[in-house]
Amino acid sequence: MVLEDRKDGSSLPGRSGSFSKSSPSELDVVDPYKRISSPGSILDAEKVEKKPGGWRAVSFILGNETLERLGSIGLLANFMVYLTKVFHLEQVDAANVINIWSGFTNLTPLVGAYISDTYVGRFKTIAFASFATLLGLITITLTASFPQLHPASCNSQDPLSCGGPNKLQIGVLLLGLCFLSVGSGGIRPCSIPFGVDQFDQRTEEGVKGVASFFNWYYMTFTVVLIITQTVVVYIQDQVSWIIGFSIPTGLMALAVVMFFAGMKRYVYVKPEGSIFSGIAQVIVAARKKRKLKLPAEDDGTVTYYDPAIKSSVLSKLHRSNQFRCLDKAAVVIEGDLTPEGPPADKWRLCSVQEVEEVKCLIRIVPIWSAGIISLAAMTTQGTFTVSQALKMDRNLGPKFEIPAGSLSVISLLTIGIFLPFYDRVFVPFMRRITGHKSGITLLQRIGTGIVFAIFSMIVAGIVERMRRIRSINAGDPTGMTPMSVFWLSPQLILMGLCEAFNIIGQIEFFNSQFPEHMRSIANSLFSLSFAGSSYLSSFLVTVVHKFSGGHDRPDWLNKNLNAGKLDYFYYLIAVLGVVNLVYFWYCARGYRYKVGLPIEDFEEDKSSDDVEMTSKKSMK
C-alpha cells in the first residue's frame, strides 16, 4: 500500500494522513519569477516582461566565469615549469605539490555546494569565492615579483648550485594555493546552477535558453583552455613570469567587477537545504527500523509513504527491489505521521522517492570509482609530459620555441576535432548496428575511454624509452635530446580520445542516472573523481620514487630523466589501467540503468493500480 496525493492535491480517500498543496507564500519562495496564477492577464504579462534573469543576466555570469577561468587556469597552466625553474623543486616534489593541491581543490566543491544549498545561496557563495580566488592569484603573483618570496636564480655555469625555497617562500606559495582552492570550492559547484536559475524552465523559451547556456558555457571553457595554454604560457615562458601572472590576476579582478555589475539583473533562488542531509535521513531512518520484516512481494500489508513530489522533479522513480533494506525508511508505522499528514520526524520516515534517490547513488558508486585510475593516467601525463618536453627539441622554425606547458593543446584540438565526428558520423553508424539511440551505451563509452587511457600510457612509455636512448647516445651534458617534441603527440592524441569518451561519458552518465534532485551530487562526484585521481597519482609517485631505486641505481623518477626509468612508471599506470578495466567490466555488467516515468504518466498509472486494487478487495 502507498500513501500518495491526487493530481488536484487532495488526499486519496480511505488513506491515513493528508498532503496538501503549498500555500501561495510557499510557492513564492521556490518561484523566483513570482508569476500569478491567471494566465494571459495584463498584470501577468507585465511581470513576465520585467522579470529579472534571462540572457541579460547570464551574460554577466558567463563573462565572470570566462575571466575567472582565464585567471586561475592561466596562472596554473604552466605551474609545473614555475615550480621546477623558479622554485627549484625536483620534478617529484613539484608533481606532488600539484597533485595534492589539485586533489584538495576538487574536494572543496563538496563543501561549497553544501554551504550554498543549505545556508547562503549561490550568489553569495560565488561572490565570496571570487574574492578568495583573487587573493590567491595576487599571492602567487607576489611570489614571482619579490626576490624575497622565491629562491635566488641559479648559476648558469653550475646548475647543481640551485637552492630550494625556504619556509617563508614555500609558506606564501601554499597560502596562495589554499586561497585558490577556497575560490574553486565556491565557484565550481555554483556557477552552472546559478546560470540555470536565470531561465524559467516552465516555458519553451526557458528550456531552449538552458540548453544554449550549456553550449556557451563549455565553448567558452574550451576557448579559455586554448588561450591559457598558448598565449599566457608563452608570455610566462618567453617574456616574464611577473607579467605572465599579472595578466591572469588583472583578468580575475575584472571578473569580480563584472559579476557584481549584474546584481540587479540576477534571479536569486533561496537555499532549500542540501541533498546530503536527505541521504543521511534515509540511512538513519532505515537503521532505526532495521528490525521490521518486509514481505517478499508487495502484498498490501505494508504502507509506504509516497507523497506528491516537488515541482522541480520531472520524473517519478519506481520502488525497486534492489537494496530493500533501505525501503524500511519509507514504511509508515504508528506515530510516524502528524495529523496534518507530513512526517513527524524526517529522521524516522522518508518518502519512496527519497529512498530510490539514495539507491541510485549506491548503484553509481562502483562505476564512479572505476573512473579514478583512468583520470590518474591523465594527471600523470599532465605533469611528466612537461618534464619530457623540457628535454626535447621544441623549436618550430628558426625563431619560435614551443612552451613545454602548451603541448596539452594537442589533446584539446583532438577533442575539438573528434567530437563533431563522433556526433555526426560515429553515432549514426553505430546506431544502425546496435539499434541504440546513442550508438553505444554510456557505460560502453566510458569503457572505451579507459582503453584509450591504457594505450596512451603504453605509447608514452615507448616514446620515453626512445627519447632516453637517443639522449644518452647524443652525450649532451645537459640531457637534451635531438628529438622533436612532436614525438609526444601520439600519447596526447590518445589521451584526448580518452577524454572525449571517458570524461564526457561520465558527465552524461552521472547527469542521466541521478534524479533531477541530485544533479548537484553528480557534479560533485565528478570533482571527487579528479580529487581521487590526484591523490592516487601523488601516492604512486611517492612510493615509486622511494622504493624503485637502490644503493647502486637511481629510482625511476629521478630528477635526471636519462638516469631514471620514467617509461617503467608509465607501464605501471598501464597495468593498473588493465586491472581497472576488468573491475569496470564487472561493475558495468551488473549495473541496472535508472528507470523513471514522467510525473503525469506515473500518477495515471498509480490511479489505475489503485482502482484495480480496490476492485479486487471489494470482490473478496
Curated annotation (Swiss-Prot):
Keywords: Cell membrane, Membrane, Nitrate assimilation, Symport, Transmembrane, Transmembrane helix, Transport, Ubl conjugation. Residues 1-32 are annotated as: Disordered. It is a multi-pass membrane protein. Gene3D superfamilies: MFS general substrate transporter like domains. It comes from the Eukaryota. The keyword Transport applies. Expressed in leaves and flowers. Detected in stems and siliques. Highest expression in the distal lamina of older leaves. Restricted to the sieve element and companion cell complex of the minor vein. Pfam families: PTR2. The keyword Oxidoreductase does not apply. SUPFAM superfamilies: MFS general substrate transporter (SSF103473). The chain crosses the membrane at residues 70-90, 95-115, 126-146, 167-187, 213-233, 241-261, 364-384, 402-422, 443-463, 485-505, 524-544, 568-588. It is found in: Cell membrane. Induction: Circadian-regulation. Expression increase during the light phase and decrease during the dark phase. Disruption phenotype: No visible phenotype when grown under normal conditions. Growth retardation when starved of nitrogen. GO terms for biological process: nitrate assimilation; nitrate transmembrane transport. GO terms for molecular function: low-affinity nitrate transmembrane transporter activity; symporter activity. Ubiquitinated by NLA. Ubiquitination of NPF2.13 leads to its degradation by the proteasome. GO terms for cellular component: plasma membrane. Residues 10-25 have a biased composition (Low complexity). PANTHER family: OLIGOPEPTIDE TRANSPORTER-RELATED (PTHR11654). Belongs to the major facilitator superfamily. Proton-dependent oligopeptide transporter (POT/PTR) (TC 2.A.17) family. Interacts with NLA. Low-affinity proton-dependent nitrate transporter. Not involved in dipeptides transport, but has a weak glucosinolate transport activity. Involved in phloem loading and nitrate remobilization from the older leaves to other tissues. This is Protein NRT1/ PTR FAMILY 2.13. It comes from Arabidopsis thaliana. The lineage of its organism: Eukaryota, Viridiplantae, Streptophyta, Embryophyta, Tracheophyta.
